[in-house]
Each structure stands twice: as C-alpha cells, then as structure tokens.
Amino acid sequence: MISLSNATLMRGELVLLNNTNLSIHNGQKIGVIGRNGSGKSSLFATLLGQLALDQGELSMPEGTRCAHMRQETEASSASALDFVIDGDQQFRRIEAQLVEAELAEDGARIAQWHSEMDKIGGYDIRFRAMQLLSGLGFSAEQFERPVASFSGGWRIRLNLAAALMAPSDLLLLDEPTNHLDLEATLWLEQWLNRYQGTLLIISHDRSFLDHVIAYVVSVEQQKLTLYRGNYSSFEIQRAERLAQEQAMLEKQQRRVAEIEDFVRRFRAKATKARQAQSRLKELDRMQLIAPAHIDSQFYFEFPKPERLP
C-alpha cells in the first residue's frame, strides 16, 4: 500500500496540498482529477521521488518499481524500436552484463546472464516492443526510423510506449491520450485493463477514464479525496456531496439565526438570561461549515500595487 499521511506540498509560496491523507492499495486503477495547477503533476513527482513533501510522510513498499510517461523527448539517432526497448532498464543492464561476459569468454557468467535474461522474458523483448508500437499507431516501416525524425506528437507516443515497456508495480500516466487517435486510444484502454499493477492516470478524456479506472482521487481545496467508481460515478458522488454540504450549511445558518434572535430578545430578561447564556455557549462550540463549492478552473494572482506619489 502507498500512503500519504498529513501531507503538505508547496511550490514556492503556493500551497498545493495541506495536511491531507491518501491510501492507495495494490492494483487500484485511479484517475487523478483536479483543475489545472491544483497539484496533480506535483503529486506524481512526489510519488516518483522527484519532489519532497514540505510536511507529512510518504510511505511506499521498498522495491516498488515505478514507471512514468515522460512529457518531452530529445532528438535522438536511436531507432523507435530501440527507444522503446530502452524503457526496460533491467533488460538493458542484463544485456550489457551478457555482452561483457561474452567478451571475456567467461562461460559461467554467460550461462548466469542467459538465465537472468530468460527470467525477464528478454528473448522476446523486440516482439513486445513491436506490439506496443503497432498498438500506438506506428507502421512496421517506422520501427527503425530515428527518434529525431518524428514530430512532437509521435515522440509523445514513443514516451508512452517506453513507459508501458518498463516492468512496473506503479504506473503513472499524465495525459496519455493527448496525441492518440481513436484506434490507438481503444488499444491503450485494453492494454491498461490487462495491467496488473497500480495505475494512476491524469486525463481530461472522460470516456477513456470511464473505460479504465475504478477509483478517482480528486485534488480539490488542497485535499486529496478518494472516490470509488469511474469518472461518471465520481461526478454523481461529488454532486451529491456538495448538495449535502449545502443542506448542512443552510441548516446551520438557520440555527445560528435562531440563537442570535433568541439572545437578542431575551438576554436582558432575568427569567431568560440563563437560557440565552446556554445558547451563546452552543454558538461558541459550533464548528462553522464552509460554503460548498468546486475549485475554479482559473487562478488569479495580482501584484501588490505600488505606492502612489
């Protein structure tokens, strides 16, 4: 299980998460939802160890293999096929050890590394990489083309293929369908439905999320809230929660108005003074409910005005 406890995360002076908690269980497939700038990508960076919490604790099982989809790719002379295979770093390490053993003509080490290669399915890795490329819309003629020859959108597809190639217990995908056509999106849905690890996806594609996820983490008002169900279910649950919060707020406001009216009318009367005092204590103990609202999609920051002459 992965857990965030009393987590606070800031970027500069902006508070993204404030004393929030989240538990993610093995094998859960989760959509991460929130307005732009709410902290979704920063949450991913924290899980990857690229950012540290300002307060609180992140707990993750030792040895958890994390894979993620990079958002940029530098021009490279490597072929598309080799780029995707590079996503499996364990394969590349064993491959390098095997080459070294063969150059040294060390029979025992050669046998050892062939055995390790067999354990990770390394002998069919080219076939698996070709399957990923084909599923994401690459033709066989493009497999050997250098990465530098592809446009930005196709390089993002290569990043996605490399992330899927990496053996992982935790897979983080940030807007994976942005540069995919319908056929590639449907293929990706099927691939992710077969994925056995824990999956977190940031996406604005509601249909895609509905077909892949079984949970939603909402990043809202500096908190992480877990909902059970796909995106459509999340929207219904959130609307119901907001309606309940609004009803509770209105009920509390009516009670506050009743207390204030009673105190105003009877505080000066000796026969009612004790009751008025009791109601004032009730008001002091009352935890005021904040108005229910959804985070705005917009964030405005105004500089401090200069002093007038």
Task: Please provide the spans of the model-predicted regions.
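Short hinge/gating elements
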Residues: 115, 264-266, 298-301
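Intracellular alpha-helical coupling/juxtamembrane segments of multi-pass membrane proteins
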Residues: 237-262, 266-293
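Amphipathic heptad-repeat alpha-helical coiled-coil/stalk segments that mediate oligomerization
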Residues: 287-309
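ABC ATP-binding cassette signature C-motif
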Residues: 1-251, 302-309
